[in-house]
From Swiss-Prot:
Pfam families (UniProt xref): NGF
Protein name, as recorded: Neurotrophin-7
PROSITE patterns referenced in this protein's UniProt entry, alphabetically: NGF_1 (PS00248), NGF_2 (PS50270)
Record organism: Danio rerio
Gene giving rise to this polypeptide: ntf7
Cellular localisation: Secreted
Propeptide residue interval(s): 20-97
């Protein structure tokens, strides 16, 4: 009786060992197959990252040693963050007065919006040349990003289906009329105005500081209606 029990225990242990060995082998083959499938993707991804790193230009650190005028609308960061998380540049605080309630109900002639631009690649300098802006550059083996703080006219979203030529973004800057303007006697539209800021650019394979033009405000442009049109009213 004891011998029969021992034989059964030996057979059960052998069967369990075979099952575990087969499961381990199947798992190893599955892992190897998955690694074989993922290896081309990882290789292609690493190859793309390597190619992207090669395209980032290297900047001489001496360019940042000179103390020159720097615009608050230009920021250099070695932490690549989203433009929405950057916030707005610091502005002087305005102390409120007791008669501030008298100014309630005032509206801007044109609505504007402010945002950070981190993918600016081309711009116009003071000489009218089309220069290449460096959105990324390497300095002291550290990759930094160049960000610009722009103010543009707010784009109105169309009600219903967009008109041909407008797309999903709505009315373009320069096509919306100004607020509070008498349309019987005046033609008006909101448009972007520009300012020049000092940025790191490349022109004719030479990296240097140059003043480039970016959007800085949204203003109203007026033009008087024709004399005949005015006589009708």
């Amino acid at each position: 009786m004891r011998s029969l029990t021992l034989v059964l225990l030996i057979l059960i242990s052998i069967q369990a060992a075979l099952i575990m060995g087969g499961h381990t082998q199947a798992q190893a083959s599955a892992n190897q197959h998955a690694a074989t499938q993922n290896s081309p993707r990882l290789y292609s991804q690493s190859k793309e990252d390597l190619h992207y790193d090669e395209l980032i230009p290297t900047v001489d650190p001496k360019l940042f040693n000179k103390r020159r005028y720097r615009s608050p609308r230009v920021v250099f960061s070695d932490v690549i963050t989203a433009e929405k998380e950057m916030g707005t540049p610091r502005r002087p605080r305005i102390r409120r007065k007791a008669n501030d309630f008298l100014h309630r109900g005032e509206y801007s002639v044109c609505d504007s919006e402010e945002h950070w631009v981190g993918n600016l690649t081309h711009a116009t300098d003071l000489g009218g040349n089309e220069v290449m802006v460096l959105p990324h550059f390497r300095i002291n083996n550290v990759v930094k990003k160049q960000l610009f703080y722009e103010t543009t006219c707010r784009v109105k979203k169309p009600i219903g289906a967009p008109k041909p030529g407008q797309g999903a973004s709505g009315v373009k800057a320069g096509t919306s009329s100004c607020r509070g303007i008498d349309s019987k006697h005046w033609n008006s539209y909101c448009t972007n105005t520009h300012t020049y800021v000092r940025a790191l650019t490349s022109y004719k394979n030479q990296i240097a500081w140059r003043f480039i033009r970016i959007n800085a405000a949204c203003v109203c442009v007026l033009s008087r209606n024709s004399w005949r049109h005015g006589l009708k009213y």
